Amino acid sequence: MTFTKLENSSDQAVVAEEVKILTKLLNESTRQLIGDDAFAKIQDLIDTSASKDQKQLESKISSLNNREMIVVARYFATLPLLINISEDVELASKVNVFNNTDQDYLGKLSDTIDLVAQKDDAKRILENVNVVPVLTAHPTQIQRKTVLELTDKIHHLLRSYRDVKNGTINQREWTEQLRACIEILMQTDIIRGHKLKVSNEITNVLAYYPKALIPAITKFTTRYKELAKEHNLTLDQATPITMGMWIGGDRDGNPYVTADTLELSATLQSQVIFEYYMKELKKLYRAISLSTSYMQPSAAVEKLSKLSNDDSPFRTDEPYRRAFYYIESRLVHTEKELLGIIDKNIFIKPHDLENLDNIPVYNNPQEFKSDLETIKASLDEDHDQAVTHSFFTQILEAIDVFGFHLATIDMRQDSSVNESCVAELLKSAGICDNYSDLSEKEKVELLLSELENDPRNLHANNKPKSELLQKELKIYKTARQLKDRLGEDVIKQHIISHTESVSDMLEQAIMLKEYNLVDSEKARIQVVPLFETVEDLLNAREIITQYLSFPIVKKWLVSQNNYQEIMLGYSDSNKDGGYLASCWNLYKAQKDLTAIGEKLGVKITYMHGRGGTVGRGGGPSYEAITAQPFKSINDRIRMTEQGEIIQNKYGNKDTAYYNLEMLASAAIDRMVSKQAVSEERITDFRSSMDKIVEESNKIYRKLVFENPAFLDYFFQATPIKEISNLNIGSRPASRKKLTDFSGLRAIPWVFSWSQSRIMFPGWYGVGSAFANFINADPTHLKELQEMYKGWPFFHSLLSNVDMFLSKSNMEIAREYASLCDDEETKKVFDIIYQEWKLTKKVILQIEDHDDLLAEAPILKQSLDYRMPYFNILNYIQIEMIKRGREDEIQGVYQSIIPITINGVASGLRNSG
């Protein structure tokens, strides 16, 4: 049975109606701001863009002065943002309608549970599933928090539009509120005036928890267990969705991440969940006002009641409220001990705050849960369980999911930093003076000896230490303290960027050992390798095989339930070898590494370092997960959620629920479903892919690494220099100087190609590789079509290429090419354009479609609708880049270009 994707069921008539209202209010606000004559120029640009007269559009834009350009840019940057909000509202509405009316759709949880329930080991599968979105602060969310708050207000107003139409809400008042939001939005700086600090990034991301993630996850977990129970499967310990966090712990290439930011991240996270618990307790306290005049609580509740400091005469016959008072007192004392603060949203009396020392703290979240369950059990005896279910279920689920820590913080550092620190430690401890000069075999032998036989901390001497080593040691010390204070789940992994050898992994273990986070018997934090480049992916098999064979590692895995996580980097492998090479090498690496783990009795799990775009491993989540290699999901899967993707997916509780449902359902589906195509046929497909990818890699590298004009083209014909100046993240755009390709981060690399509308990382090298394969044998086209129809990996691969071809615009890209200084550099565009045309032709052949996005009609309509508006922004951006690069006075250009970057990113809906 084929189910509908909710994204393809949106009512575009409703979206168009709302966009019409938003556009009208935007026009009125803009006209009031700039006057009729100036607004007439905006309308003229819209008409010219719609007529597709490119030269005329360029001429009219170039005639605008800088002052006019600011207002025009603001208008066209705001319009796609408003369209996005309307589309998000429609999706959220569809989620509610389909769930409330029990309609099926692709990825619906009930259908997924029904599928699993047929398995003999259904309980084990559902109990162990754990899908973890890991929120990161990579610099692709270019909108300010202030702007996001305004868009939230507009979102909520549009959610009530149906009530406006039927008269439940006053239309005039509603319209004026919407107008006010749009007027404020038009006069608010879209881009930050100063570079973000890590602390800003932490608070920005944590804002999604109270409004969306906590209610969505608790609702999802509750529903998950209810559906399992319908099949007589009781899942007491299941946490199908938990959250991860990189901000504050990811110091790879970011000098501003320190022990202090790690402490801050953990503390602020904990504050968020304590605040949630306090609010929920207040609701329970107010709601459950049962009197002993009408019922008798259990002896256990009576005991809690008597421990309460609540001496109000109005509570003497209300044992449940007295019990809640005691529970809150314990929770307040716990927060004070753990975080040094007292939440403002409490109901216990001020004088009782002075006597908290007489109230015991909760030693762990389960003690808190136990007290609540005591009350629930008592109420269940006297009432229908449906009554208590509505009061208690979500807070009890929240305790299991979020504990006192909210989300698990990942630590990450580059392998070169670890090597430097370990070399210094070994030298200062008198163990080895020339560690970095040792062979790989010698390094491994030395490191294993230290880990297995030397219990001391190598830093525990009075010898002076480098600034780098001091900084790193302080971070590990803080990690140890946080785990002791907030529980084991607050930090569970340390990721090593650029893992190129087994010694890289053992060096990480040495650093963890300095504060007893690993010892010869167990590991409190797991060492997680990150394989990023194509070469690293090829070497991963040998590295993991050797690492898992060490006796000490086998002991560590026992303390980690025999799971070993491996992180896969999509961005650098794409930048290194192109889209096909990246995807295929990642696919093969997963398949091989999973088999290695199975052979050695270890469950390999994966952390997917995806970005928002196809070029960074992005694309639709459901399809991306179901496209993973067969048997490669062993209970757990983690993936990064970055930048604007966080707002798109988790901006409100309804779309958050839906996207979490998609992630979990896809993971479970991939775990239990059988391959649609035989293993023998898949083997044939793999053989063909090896040939295609080899060709694609050659084509990609011939341009990117062998054409001497390519780098000049990239730095001149994209806004990379302008993007590097944006205040969109705490992390530098490049590890080295900006014009160094090897040090250029994948995010600005992809972001720049998106802005210039080429979308290069999402398709280059694909067309020629497929065309050459087809030309070699006419039957190959039929094989590729079979692969597209029957192999989820290949279908997802081509669908993503299709999407990015549809978002590219070669006419606009040609204008960016005009920014190049010389003709040789400009010729690079001709190479790119020829490959684009070929790729589009071949993709449509394989898909057997007449047009791009044939399987995503709503996305096609959306792009068709918004293209005329945000295409204008590209031409404005090109004009301002020309003026800015010719003019030594940069101020005005630095204020206009970021507006255009914001608008184009909003229009494309995935920037980096």
UniProtKB/Swiss-Prot annotation:
Cross-referenced Gene3D superfamilies: Phosphoenolpyruvate/pyruvate domain
EC number: 4.1.1.31
Keyword Glycoprotein: no
Cofactors named for this entry: Mg(2+)
Keywords: Carbon dioxide fixation, Lyase, Magnesium
One MF term in the entry's GO annotations: magnesium ion binding
Protein name: Phosphoenolpyruvate carboxylase
Gene of this entry: ppc
